[in-house]
A protein has these predicted regions:
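N-terminal leader/linker segments that initiate helical-solenoid repeat arrays
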Residues: 17-75, 83-84, 125, 137, ...
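Terminal, low-structured helical/coil segments at or just beyond the last alpha-helical repeat
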Residues: 27-32, 165-171, 188, 275-277, ...
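"A position-specific structural signal for the A-helix of alpha-solenoid helical repeats
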Residues: 38, 75, 109, 171-175, ...
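Structural motif corresponding to the intra-repeat A-B loop/turn of tetratricopeptide repeats
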Residues: 46, 83, 117, 180, ...
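Short solvent-exposed coil/turn linkers within tandem alpha-helical repeat scaffolds
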Residues: 62-69, 98-105, 135-146, 160-164, ...
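Residue-level recognition of tetratricopeptide repeat
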Residues: 78, 112, 178, 212, ...
């Protein structure tokens, strides 16, 4: 998120603690001007951080009315957030929700606390809470006695005033999901994100990444479910086409579909539009790898079908495109070695296996084993058939 957007979001969070905030969703607590409560709040806002907590305690004790307790809890949340005492912020945030369940700014504050703490579980719990509050507000009918046109205008203005907070929540959620270290949890968070923001480019991208994460978590059924769901909505999603072409070809399943997906990905790689947030060099590298990956899957399909000459053609084309990705390059050369062996071209196979063993990847040891076998075979005289 840009620094400007972060600053705006944080300013809105601070502004939410002012009395009768117009951007607030939930209860509006009116603090009479010049009242004792008003003076106490002014003193809290002006106080040095080291003195704020005692003043907030005094305000909470001297104003037991439930509405004023809402204000007190808001002050506690703000104080503990600034002090980075996140568990205390959560404690008072829950107290605030008990008094004011639709307090949107409190939900945003809880998202902020969870994001800063790195608590992904709470981040998504409160993110879903924030989105639910907004959704309910958007769907709410006009209050009794309110003209529908006036209500539409008021609601639009309020939603516009909350746009930066809404953007902050969305970006905190997607950032938290991508940063989750456990692939199974990362996938689940991305799916939850997609449900909160359906029919958006961010949702589709999140699901594509979720499918890959499910595969990393060795949950192939969920990978297939999510990946096929993405393709049902966007048949040209190159990331998912590559994922499924790779999976099917490697397993020797649905080879015709794998070949179709791989060929489609090759074609799409030449027509994709570069996003604004990526350099020309980075973009060229990405589409080069994508095209090479697709060609490697084509080659693997041919290998599975015992079409070794076609496999050599596709894998050789992929070879030059995958050099910047050690893992994909090594696997491609390993496959190419077998394609050459099937054609009885030992010298070419040896070269391919040597290239596979030359980079640091899981295929190095396997390629070295094949090279040892080929070396032994070359030195061992062929057994003659009995006459």
């Amino acid at each position: 998120m840009s620094s400007t957007r972060i600053l705006t979001a944080l300013l809105l969070l601070s502004a939410s603690l002012a009395p009768a905030c117009k951007a607030q969703l939930g209860k509006n607590v009116m603090i009479p001007a010049g009242s004792d409560a008003d003076h106490q709040l002014n003193a809290i806002n002006a106080a040095d951080p080291s003195q704020k907590l005692a003043l907030i305690d005094t305000f909470a004790k001297s104003n037991p009315d439930p509405d004023f307790q809402i204000v007190a809890d808001e002050q506690y949340v703000n104080y503990y957030l600034n002090a980075k005492q996140y568990e205390k912020a959560f404690e008072y945030g829950e107290k605030l929700f008990a008094l004011d369940p639709n307090n949107y700014v409190n939900a945003v504050n809880m998202v902020r606390a969870a994001a800063e703490k790195g608590d992904h579980t709470k981040l998504f719990t409160y993110g879903e809470k924030a989105n639910s509050i907004l959704a309910n507000y958007k769907a709410a009918p006009p209050p009794e006695g309110t003209n529908p046109d006036d209500w539409s205008r008021i609601r639009t203005e309020k939603l516009v005033s909350l746009r930066d907070d809404e953007d902050y929540v969305e970006e905190a959620l997607i950032g938290g999901a991508y940063n989750a270290k456990d692939p199974a949890k990362r996938a689940d968070y991305l799916v939850r994100f997609s449900k909160m923001y359906p029919n958006t480019p961010e949702s589709e991208q999140a699901l594509a990444v979720a499918a890959t994460a499910y595969l990393q978590a060795q949950n192939r059924p969920k990978m297939l479910e999510v990946a096929n769901g993405v393709l049902a909505k966007d048949p040209d999603n190159i990331d998912v086409l590559l994922l499924l072409a790779d999976d099917y070809s490697e397993r020797g399943e649905q080879l015709d579909k794998a070949d179709t997906y791989a060929k489609k990905a090759v074609s799409l790689a030449d027509t994709l539009k570069k996003p604004d947030n990526i350099s020309d060099e980075e973009w060229q590298k990405k589409i080069t790898i994508q095209k090479g990956w697709a060609l490697s899957s084509e080659g693997q399909v041919s290998l599975q079908k015992k079409q070794s000459a076609q496999a050599v053609d596709s894998l050789s084309k992929a070879s030059t495109l995958l050099r910047s990705n050690a893992g994909l390059y090594a696997r491609n050369q390993y496959r190419l070695g077998f394609a050459y062996l099937n054609l009885k071209k030992t010298a070419e196979a040896t070269k391919a296996f040597t290239e596979a063993a030359s980079v640091d990847s899981p295929y190095r040891a396997m390629a070295e084993d094949k090279l040892s076998e080929l070396g032994t075979a070359a030195k061992t005289p062929a057994h003659k058939k009995p006459s």
